[in-house]
């Protein structure tokens, strides 16, 4: 608030207080992202969510998102199954590739494998989530032949979403697995995502899956009035957008601009949408 960064440890403690307050006022869900850079505090969402589970009663607790591409799908499931047990069935996971890529060199992964890592790890996670002995093989890890994963969830499958940054390929991937989808509206207008929502509905039907929930994510700020919220929020939003623009190039933003900041995605898929 005073223009100086807040220490990461303090941010984490404040987030726990926010989770408690969200539970007290009756919000449905509380999610935290996974980042591995100086301007974000949460690098281990499941550890935070376990702490939040012990301090809340009803609110659902999830990631937003877990960067599956640079993690182990089996460990992701195990950690969220643990949070689910601690919270008595309130855990859910949101899977994504992440628009930030710091985790790839940090964990010894090659960005050239960006596509195949998510493809294969999502396939493996889906098998683990079914809570049956796993038989799987791919290019990114050794085969698994008939092993089981523990702990299992008590009463249900682990609720899982896929976060999508705004490309048809990602929408089709989500529909192929029949998962609920959340659109990350980082920039631009919500209306620009309407065609993707239509594509998701169509693809879910083509793949033979029952329709699942759709949701959106968008940055925001709450104040006493809309004008006050804009005045308080815009300088910080602008600073972050321009910082990302400097890192990723060439975009910067001002009050007349709204830029979609993301990574191009390409994917081969046998689904062909109807014209």
Task: Name each model feature, range by range.
Residues 6-8, 41-43, 73-74, 106-108, ...:
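Short, solvent-exposed loop/turn segments at secondary-structure boundaries
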Residues 1, 30-32, 61-64, 91-95, ...:
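Hydrophobic faces of well-ordered beta-strands that scaffold small-molecule active sites
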Residues 1-13, 64-74, 154-166, 221-223, ...:
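Active-site mouth loops of central-metabolism enzymes
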Residues 1-61, 156-158:
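N-terminal beta1-alpha1-beta2 module of alpha/beta enzyme domains
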Residues 39, 101-103, 170, 223-226:
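Short catalytic/ligand-binding loop motif for oxyanion handling, primarily in non-cytosolic enzymes
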Residues 112-149, 190-275:
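An alpha-helical appendage that flanks or caps ligand/catalytic pockets
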Residues 36-44, 68-74, 188-193, 222:
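Acidic-and-aromatic substrate-binding clefts and catalytic sites of carbohydrate-active enzymes
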Residues 69-179, 191-198, 202, 206:
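Internal, glycine-rich beta/alpha segment that forms the wall or movable "lid"
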């Amino acid at each position: 608030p005073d223009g100086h960064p807040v220490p990461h440890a303090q941010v984490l403690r404040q987030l726990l207080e926010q989770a408690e307050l969200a539970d007290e006022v009756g919000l449905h869900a509380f999610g935290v992202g996974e980042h591995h850079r100086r301007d974000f505090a949460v690098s281990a969402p499941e550890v935070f969510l376990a702490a939040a589970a012990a301090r809340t009663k009803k609110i659902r607790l999830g990631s937003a998102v877990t960067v599956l591409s640079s993690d182990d799908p089996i460990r992701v499931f195990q950690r969220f199954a643990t949070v689910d047990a601690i919270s008595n069935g309130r855990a859910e996971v949101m899977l994504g590739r992440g628009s930030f890529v710091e985790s790839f060199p940090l964990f010894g992964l090659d960005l050239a494998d960006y596509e195949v890592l998510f493809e294969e790890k999502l396939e493996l996670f889906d098998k683990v989530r079914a809570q049956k002995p796993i038989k799987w093989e791919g290019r990114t890890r050794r085969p698994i032949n008939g092993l089981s994963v523990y702990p299992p969830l008590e009463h249900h499958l682990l609720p899982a979403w896929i976060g999508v940054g705004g490309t048809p390929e990602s929408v089709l991937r989500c529909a192929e697995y029949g998962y609920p989808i959340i659109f990350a509206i980082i920039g631009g207008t919500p209306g620009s995502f309407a065609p993707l929502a239509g594509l998701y509905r169509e693809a879910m039907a083509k793949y033979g899956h029952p329709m699942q929930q759709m949701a959106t994510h968008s940055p925001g700020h709450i104040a006493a009035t809309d004008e006050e919220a804009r005045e308080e929020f815009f300088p910080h939003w602008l600073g972050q957008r321009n910082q990302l623009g400097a890192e990723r190039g060439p975009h910067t933003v001002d009050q007349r601009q709204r830029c979609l900041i993301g990574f191009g995605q390409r994917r081969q898929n046998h689904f062909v949408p109807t014209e």
